[in-house]
Amino acid sequence: MNQTENMEGTTTVGFVCTDGVVLATETRATMGSLVANKNADKLFQIDDKIGATIAGTVSHAQSLMDILKAEISLYKLRNEKDMSIDALAVLTSNILKSRPYYVQTILAGVDKDGAKLYTLDPSGSYIPDTFTSTGSGSPYAFGVLEDRYNEDITTEEGKKIAIKAITSAMERDVYSGNNYRLGVITKDGMKIYTKEEIAQIKKQL
């Protein structure tokens, strides 16, 4: 399996709301045309009010998330304050530039300046944005986001849009499927929703 095949699967979405950020993914992991795992975790909490999604090689993604968690903890010990989302985006960019991680990630969270979101690709380039999607199912997810998203929505409204976007990708992209992961970050912290809670959100679509 080559590196391009590693990057084929996955759909993730993220966007900024008036009171925080919403992140969502599906859970299918593929190796070429094989569904290797139906419950792959692509949503991570890397600090109290910072989350990330990943698309790409699983081992690289797990390694990158572990490094970011360690760097954030070290920063807090040294500086006695939280790392900003902007600083974390720069740090992640430098890590990606220093070695070949075949990972595309969305970093998002809430800091003293409010809610922020960045998309980073394997080359280390990083882009601030209000909404985005990554992975093979992203064209379908973007269709929903372009139609439903606006910067005035709350996270309560955003949860439904995120699940709708992931559902659209799962219905059309063979590399995306199985289950959902949903996280909401506000000034109070990050909440990762259970399957039962997500099922209730789906009923409202």
UniProtKB/Swiss-Prot annotation:
The keyword DNA repair does not apply. One of its GO terms (biological process) is proteasomal protein catabolic process. One of its GO terms (molecular function) is threonine-type endopeptidase activity. The keyword Cytoplasm applies. Its EC number is 3.4.25.1. Residues 1-9 form a propeptide. SUPFAM superfamilies: N-terminal nucleophile aminohydrolases (Ntn hydrolases). It comes from the Archaea. Its main location: cytoplasm. CDD domains: proteasome_beta_archeal. It is found in: Cytoplasm. InterPro entries: Ntn_hydrolases_N (IPR029055), Pept_T1A_Psome_bsu_arc (IPR019983), Pept_T1A_subB (IPR000243), Proteasome_sua/b (IPR001353), Proteasome_suB-type (IPR023333). Keywords: Autocatalytic cleavage, Cytoplasm, Hydrolase, Protease, Proteasome, Threonine protease, Zymogen. The formation of the proteasomal ATPase PAN-20S proteasome complex, via the docking of the C-termini of PAN into the intersubunit pockets in the alpha-rings, triggers opening of the gate for substrate entry. Interconversion between the open-gate and close-gate conformations leads to a dynamic regulation of the 20S proteasome proteolysis activity. It catalyses: Cleavage of peptide bonds with very broad specificity. The active site is at T10 (nucleophile). Pfam families: Proteasome (PF00227). GO terms for cellular component: cytoplasm; proteasome core complex, beta-subunit complex. Component of the proteasome core, a large protease complex with broad specificity involved in protein degradation. NCBIfam families: arc_protsome_B. The 20S proteasome core is composed of 14 alpha and 14 beta subunits that assemble into four stacked heptameric rings, resulting in a barrel-shaped structure. The two inner rings, each composed of seven catalytic beta subunits, are sandwiched by two outer rings, each composed of seven alpha subunits. The catalytic chamber with the active sites is on the inside of the barrel. Has a gated structure, the ends of the cylinder being occluded by the N-termini of the alpha-subunits. Is capped at one or both ends by the proteasome regulatory ATPase, PAN. Belongs to the peptidase T1B family. This is Proteasome subunit beta. The lineage of its organism: Archaea, Methanobacteriati, Methanobacteriota, Methanomada group, Methanobacteria. The gene is psmB.
